[in-house]
Amino acid sequence: MGCAIVNGHTILLLVVDRDYRGQGIGEGLLRECEETIRKNGFEKVVLGVGFDYLMPGVPTSRQWAPSVHEHLDPMVNTAASDFFEHRGYVHAWGACNCFDMRMQLEDFCQNDHRIGDMIDGILYRWAVDSDLNEICLCADDACQYQDESFSKYYCNASLYHGDSHQRVLVAEKQGRIVGTLIVSIETEGKDTGNVGCTCVATAEAHQGIATRMVMLGTRYLRDIGLKHANLSYTYSNLNKMYGASGYEISTYYFMGEKVIKLCET
């Protein structure tokens, strides 16, 4: 009928079968989750992203800031986010949206360049093993003002094998790596590709490098015969960059948090 998964202070999943909703089952599961988190010594409950995650937050059609490039999945609505908001949870990202994007690759029409081309003095190519140190430096530099660095996502050795389902695209300027992107092939289902973990060195930001990497990676996915492309867990303003390739927002996320009182001892 329903289930929930807790890890540390995070509710990774809370779901009730459609036929059993409106009977208090979800509320009971939430109460048990909060009590478990409280007993484990935490003062805050997080929905979605925490020590680990299945999805960034609670899927919703609601947005917290004006947005563009939007084409929501018709199955997405505000029911789940309303459930948590009515029980004291707030969107922790303020006036910033979190969302997934997707596109049909038959609609991709940016055909001017492909991976391997030199564009405006920058070479866009597949990474090799010997690039790893520079890739990590680039990712750390790009994320220096964020809570999390993306360099850890680039450390898997299989990313640098030509036959892997995930590969790293880099932007190289005068022998130095200034941009990185992970391109994934059918890791999220048949006929579906993914681009993400986009990083550009701070000194090279706002020059179109990220937009170009996304276009080239997306063209590659189309050219090898995939039908769909997704990108997950991104946020306000980046939809413009991804939208230049044709991606549209498919679902928003309620990044819910709630402060709870510790158990008295």
PLM regions and their residue ranges:
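Acyl-donor-binding surface of acyltransferase catalytic domains
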Residues: R31-I119, F254-K258
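Short amphipathic alpha-helix that is part of the acyltransferase structural core
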Residues: T10, D112-S149
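Short glycine/proline-centered loop/turn elements that form peptide/ligand docking sites
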Residues: V214, S236-L238, I260
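Feature marks short, surface-exposed loop/turn motifs that line or immediately flank catalytic pockets
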Residues: F51-M55, T187, N237
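Conserved acetyl-CoA-binding loop-helix of GNAT-fold acetyltransferases
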Residues: G22-R38, V200, H206-R219, D223, ...
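A short, internal acetyl-CoA/4′-phosphopantetheine-binding micro-motif in the GNAT/acyltransferase core
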Residues: I11-G22, V49-Y53, C197-H206
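Conserved hydrophobic beta-strand within the GNAT/NAT acetyltransferase core sheet
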Residues: I11, V45-V49, V195, A229-Y233
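A conserved beta-strand-loop-helix scaffold within acyl/acetyltransferase catalytic domains
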Residues: M1-H9, L13-L14, C143-V200
